[in-house]
């Protein structure tokens, strides 16, 4: 007769430690128990259900919040500069936390910098690249169902989507923080945060600057978010330089006017460059033109930052670009010390480290 098999007791699983109370960012209404903004309005219902702590749009930040984010970003930069290539000296503040990245559109800098930021703070990453083709979205699953599923695996979601407003829908659905990493031609708030942070680092101030936004201003979510965010500062002047088919939309112009921000449209890049502290160049976004390739070809190449622009640009000024670059900034500009776009991209790591820390564990 076979001997009875001994049974081993299962090890006890320790209870998870309670999550710290998050310090909410201002201006977005609370997710639970919020008062509806307007009866019978679906959009108002979505807006009312947003929880403090989501990063959805540039308008949600006031100057106090920006100051705090930038202070933490400087701490993250100092931390990174003081750590070794093998990780010695790095923070483990997000150890035990898991970030999910859901990217329905291509990304290099945003996705990789978020993933690097999470890992450099000790956290882990679940990643979905090309989610439009290689996730259940290809089978027809709704964004809301995807968010409800993914939030069960993670502590925070970073979402890039091809539809404007998708991040709001995700935030209204999820019970964990959602970060908008770009929603179609809508907004890209974390890019705006790193852009404004970069301007402060490069120029030394934010109040009183003159900013030239150049290129695809109709489809570029980065310029929209930057315009919203820079309006928080005093005595700003913005120049819009773009081909006729991709001019800045009226909603941004109306918002700037309502905030007392002076703006001007111009067709002369050289004249604008001679007046500006920052030239913010963008590519013409072919993917937004659909079948109207003729309009894309007409717009592409009209405004290029090259040696002629450098010759009139003030010595203290900088050239920025959200990247990727095509041919709208010539390669020979890269060696000029005023070319700040790669320093700008590096700042994205520090800003995103700061956001993850503030959203998940607080200051």
Swiss-Prot record:
Residue ranges, annotated region (Disordered): 1-21
Subunit structure: Homotrimer.
Similarity field: Belongs to the aspartate/ornithine carbamoyltransferase superfamily. ATCase family.
Organism of provenance: Oryza sativa subsp. japonica (Rice)
GO biological process: 'de novo' pyrimidine nucleobase biosynthetic process; 'de novo' UMP biosynthetic process; cellular response to phosphate starvation; glutamine metabolic process
Compartment(s) where it occurs, according to its Swiss-Prot or TrEMBL record: Plastid, Chloroplast
Primary location class: plastid
Protein residues bound to L-aspartate: 139, 221, 283
Sorted UniProt keywords: Allosteric enzyme, Chloroplast, Plastid, Pyrimidine biosynthesis, Transferase, Transit peptide
Listed name of the protein: Aspartate carbamoyltransferase, chloroplastic
GO molecular function: amino acid binding; aspartate carbamoyltransferase activity
Ranges of compositional bias, category Pro residues: 11-21
Pathway(s) the chain acts in: Pyrimidine metabolism; UMP biosynthesis via de novo pathway; (S)-dihydroorotate from bicarbonate: step 2/3
Keyword DNA repair among UniProt keywords: no
Record-listed UMP binding positions: 109-110, 160, 188, 221, 283
Transit peptide: 1-36
């Amino acid at each position: 007769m076979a001997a009875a098999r001994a049974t081993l007791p299962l090890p006890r699983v320790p209870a998870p430690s309670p999550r710290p109370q998050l310090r909410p960012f201002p201006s977005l209404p609370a997710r639970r128990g919020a008062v509806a903004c307007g009866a019978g309005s679906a959009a108002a219902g979505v807006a009312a259900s947003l929880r403090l702590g989501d990063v959805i749009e540039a308008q949600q930040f006031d100057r106090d919040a920006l100051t705090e984010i930038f202070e933490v970003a400087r701490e993250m930069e100092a931390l990174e500069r003081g750590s070794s290539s093998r990780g010695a000296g790095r923070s483990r503040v997000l150890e035990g936390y898991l970030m999910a990245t859901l990217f329905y559109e291509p990304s290099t800098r945003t996705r990789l910098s978020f993933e690097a930021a999470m890992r450099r703070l000790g956290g882990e990453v679940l990643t979905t690249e090309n989610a439009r083709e290689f996730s259940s979205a290809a089978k027809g699953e709704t964004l809301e169902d995807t968010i409800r599923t993914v939030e069960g695996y993670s502590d925070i979601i970073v979402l890039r989507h091809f539809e404007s407003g998708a991040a709001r829908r995700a935030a209204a659905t999820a019970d964990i923080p959602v970060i908008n990493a770009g929603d179609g031609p809508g907004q890209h708030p974390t890019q705006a945060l790193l852009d404004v942070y970069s301007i402060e680092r490069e120029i030394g101030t934010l109040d009183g600057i003159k900013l030239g936004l150049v290129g695809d201003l109709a489809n570029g979510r980065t310029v929209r978010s930057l315009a919203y965010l820079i309006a928080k500062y005093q005595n700003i002047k913005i120049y819009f330089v773009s081909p006729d088919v991709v001019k800045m939309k009226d909603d941004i112009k109306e918002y700037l006017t309502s905030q007392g921000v002076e703006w001007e449209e111009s067709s002369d890049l050289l004249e604008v460059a001679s007046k500006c502290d920052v030239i913010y160049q963008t590519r013409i976004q072919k993917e937004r033109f659909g079948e109207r390739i003729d309009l894309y070809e007409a717009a592409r190449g009209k405004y290029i930052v090259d040696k002629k622009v450098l010759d009139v640009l003030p010595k203290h000024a900088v050239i920025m670009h959200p990247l990727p670059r095509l041919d709208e900034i010539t390669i020979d500009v890269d060696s000029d010390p005023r070319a700040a776009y790669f320093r700008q991209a590096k700042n994205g790591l520090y800003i995103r480290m700061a956001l993850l820390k503030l959203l998940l564990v607080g200051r």
